[in-house]
Amino acid sequence: MPAGHEEFDIPFPSRVNPFHARAEDRHVAWMRAMGLITGDAAEATYRRWSPAKVGARWFYLAQGEDLDLGCDIFGWFFAYDDHFDGPTGTDPRQTAAFVNRTVAMLDPRADPTGEHPLNIAFHDLWQRESAPMSPLWQRRAVDHWTQYLTAHITEATNRTRHTSPTIADYLELRHRTGFMPPLLDLIERVWRAEIPAPVYTTPEVQTLLHTTNQNINIVNDVLSLEKEEAHGDPHNLVLVIQHERQSTRQQALATARRMIDEWTDTFIRTEPRLPALCGRLGIPLADRTSLYTAVEGMRAAIRGNYDWCAETNRYAVHRPTGTGRATTPW
């Protein structure tokens, strides 16, 4: 763990896919082919983030096209998220116009010709992600992608109004409209383990999904705090706590840490209840295996997110003042 990083007790083993180096080469080639990275200097900057390592940690058993998909979706997310760090992200109308074009790529009839490279890349990803999945999963994933994408409009409005959300509103926004719901769907896709419909909506599985979602979101908030603060972005739980409670930085960090510990503990207490749940519902053994595999994917994501956020150069502070430009690959 690099010096200066907040540390958390994440009681899951740290793992990384042994094919991550080759996966990164394929991933960077895809980013260049999609027009998301242009030129050798941009590629060198991007590689310093260890971009494929996050997918390799989340999907430590994946191979081939499955691993590539996982890495490519993360890479697209970095580029899409950073796109709104510029002028578009402070203009709700521009943001809405851009986001609506991205959402349109989820339509089976969508033609990406002439679209922005981010939307062309998203169309490619959605075709690859959705193809082997059930219609039920696809409908759920469309809803989650749409919620995530349209949340950028809310964030742009907040930036324009210089609005800081309440703690409760922020946690709800992160839970419903952050990148995590699409990533939880991605776990099912890459691990080839679709959660059986009868158990997906149960309190036990929803608790596991919720605690995974919030754990990863807020660990990310803590470890990216300096970068986001330097950029003037108020959408970070530590900053929200400080603003609402008029607390010190250390007090806000301590509150965030307690939340993360509680979510981790809840996950650990809930997981052992799954076999009995499946027994009560009469879930076939093959479907139980899919559920257990998806939950292992959640555990790998919780740990992998923490490890990668702590090791990547993406969250280094590139803007010592509020006027300088960040060193990014875009």
Swiss-Prot record:
The keyword Mitochondrion does not apply. SUPFAM superfamilies: Terpenoid synthases. Binds 3 Mg(2+) ions per subunit. GO terms for biological process: geranyl diphosphate metabolic process. A motif (NXXXSXXXE motif) lies at residues 220-228. A motif (DDXXD motif) lies at residues 81-85. Its cofactor is Mg(2+). It catalyses: (2E)-geranyl diphosphate + H2O = 1,8-cineole + diphosphate; neryl diphosphate + H2O = 1,8-cineole + diphosphate. GO terms for molecular function: 1,8-cineole synthase activity; magnesium ion binding; terpene synthase activity. Its EC number is 4.2.3.108. Mg(2+) 3 binds at N220, S224, E228. The Asp-Asp-Xaa-Xaa-Asp (DDXXD) and Asn-Xaa-Xaa-Xaa-Ser-Xaa-Xaa-Xaa-Glu (NSE) motifs are important for the catalytic activity, presumably through binding to Mg(2+). Belongs to the terpene synthase family. In vitro, catalyzes the formation of 1,8-cineole from geranyl diphosphate (GPP). Can also accept neryl diphosphate (NPP) as substrate to produce 1,8-cineole. This is 1,8-cineole synthase. It comes from Streptomyces clavuligerus.
